[in-house]
UniProtKB/Swiss-Prot annotation:
SMART domains: HLH (SM00353), ORANGE (SM00511). The orange domain and the basic helix-loop-helix motif mediate repression of specific transcriptional activators, such as basic helix-loop-helix protein dimers. The C-terminal WRPW motif is a transcriptional repression domain necessary for the interaction with Groucho, a transcriptional corepressor recruited to specific target DNA by Hairy-related proteins. Pfam families: Hairy_orange (PF07527), HLH (PF00010). Its main location: nucleus. Residues 89-122 form the Orange domain. This is Enhancer of split m5 protein. A motif (WRPW motif) lies at residues 175-178. GO terms for biological process: cell differentiation; nervous system development; regulation of neurogenesis. Participates in the control of cell fate choice by uncommitted neuroectodermal cells in the embryo. Transcriptional repressor. Binds DNA on N-box motifs: 5'-CACNAG-3'. Transcription repression requires formation of a complex with a corepressor protein (Groucho). Forms homodimers.
Length: 178
């Protein structure tokens, strides 16, 4: 008689095969990618921070240090607020006034009266600019007027002829020292 063989073959389903072989392999690959990214992040933060102490930290400490570093960078980027054009102009005007004052003080033939007159004039003009800027700011914050009578919806031909007959004063332009 022939030896009896166990004809029962074990069938492995795809799910069982996945759980046994593929899942651990995919998990190792995922962890390898994460570790590679963490190492790259660690070197980048150490490079930008200029501190090699982060290279000796464990993963959790390194991630915390990276978060702190990124938050500092965001705060630094938000801090510099561009100055308003008028503020920039005021700063330039004051620099020009101080330069004029320095030059006049160093000029031996310059009389004191002329220097006082020039500096007084520059101060008066600066005050006038500040007042004009305050008026302009209050006008822009109030309700905007229509650009023309026609755009308001209450336009008549009589208003047009009256406004052409009476000339309006032209607004003075802002004096600039250059």
């Amino acid at each position: 008689m022939a030896p009896q063989s166990n004809n029962s073959t074990t069938f492995v389903s795809k799910t069982q095969h996945y759980l046994k072989v593929k899942k651990p392999l995919l998990e190792r690959q995922r962890r390898a990618r994460m570790n590679k990214c963490l190492d790259t992040l660690k070197t980048l933060v150490a490079e930008f921070q200029g501190d090699d102490a982060i290279l000796r930290m464990d993963k959790a400490e390194m991630l915390e240090a990276a978060l702190v570093f990124m938050r500092k960078q965001v705060v630094k980027q938000q801090a510099p607020v561009s100055p308003l054009p008028m503020d920039s102009f005021k700063n330039g005007y004051m620099n020009a006034v101080s330069e004029i004052s320095r030059v006049m003080a160093c000029t031996p033939a310059m009389s004191v009266d002329v220097g006082k007159t020039v500096m007084t004039h520059l101060g008066v003009e600066f005050q006038r600019m500040l007042q004009a800027d305050q008026v302009q700011t209050s006008v822009t914050t109030s309700t905007p007027r229509p650009l023309s009578p026609a755009s308001s919806g209450y336009h008549s031909d009589n208003e047009d002829s009256q406004s052409a007959a009476s000339p309006k004063p032209v607004e003075e332009t802002m004096w600039r020292p250059w």
